[in-house]
């Protein structure tokens, strides 16, 4: 998935990549800050600040538009279908060369003033289903959005969001993630060594916690081994299969 904030100017500043299903917004960026529990970046030419925090099967964004105008959000699935909802978007994306679908449910704190399907560099306001959905927010300069993902269904993605994130406060979600990581990495305290050596050690320790991944969703899980949904029997199902989370385009 691609989540792309844009200031509407000429055709939403969207350039086609030669494929209708792959629209992009051209960004340059600076002041990037990455931690295990947060991400922020300034899209300098667009004058847009993006803040992000992940949860288990959900994530949250705060987008600040620095320029007055008709601000918009484009959600794109490279290989799937999206539907414009009252406050956002739902749908699925197929992982390349597999039968596996990643489902998405995304909602914003503000109701979009209008919405439509982006295709051929233009937005069809009459259509509400397609590979790329454009949501318009007018002169609103601050946009909050949150999403859930699932390997089971868009409805389950919504449940995952409602379970993991109940706020539109990015800092609150990031702070919760920071506490979890501090508790986890703080189980081992090292003495001596240089700061560089400590960074290497804790970076390596952090990476050991990136795998395995719990794919259970309210007692069920999708297995890519047979393409079926199973009951987990009360035992979380772990695998090295990655979730693919929507993120700002670079």
Predicted regions and their residues:
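Beta-sandwich/jelly-roll carbohydrate-recognition scaffolds of carbohydrate-active enzymes
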Residues: 6, 10-239
């Amino acid at each position: 998935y691609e989540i792309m904030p844009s200031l509407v100017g000429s055709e939403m500043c969207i350039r086609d990549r030669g494929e209708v299903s792959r629209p992009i917004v051209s960004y340059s960026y600076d002041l990037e800050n990455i931690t295990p529990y947060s991400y922020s970046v300034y899209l300098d030419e667009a004058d847009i600040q993006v803040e992000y925090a992940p949860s288990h099967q959900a994530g949250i964004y705060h987008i600040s538009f620095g320029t007055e105008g008709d601000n918009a959000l484009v959600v794109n699935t490279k290989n799937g279908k999206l539907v414009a909802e009252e406050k956002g978007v739902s749908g699925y994306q197929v992982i390349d060369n597999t039968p596996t679908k990643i489902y998405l449910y995304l909602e914003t704190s503000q109701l979009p003033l209008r919405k439509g399907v982006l295709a051929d560099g233009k937005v069809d306001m009459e259509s509400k289903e397609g590979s790329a959905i454009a949501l318009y927010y007018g002169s609103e300069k601050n946009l909050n959005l949150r999403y859930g993902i699932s390997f089971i269904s868009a409805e389950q993605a919504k449940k995952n969001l409602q379970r993991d994130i109940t706020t539109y406060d990015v800092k609150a979600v990031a702070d919760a993630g920071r506490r979890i990581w501090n508790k986890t990495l703080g189980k081992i305290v090292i003495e001596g060594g240089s700061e560089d050596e400590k960074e290497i050690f804790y970076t390596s320790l952090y990476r050991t916690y990136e795998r395995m991944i719990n794919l259970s969703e309210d007692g069920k899980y999708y297995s890519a081994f047979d393409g079926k949904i199973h009951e987990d029997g009360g035992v979380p199902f772990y695998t090295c299969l990655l979730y693919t989370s929507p993120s700002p385009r670079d």
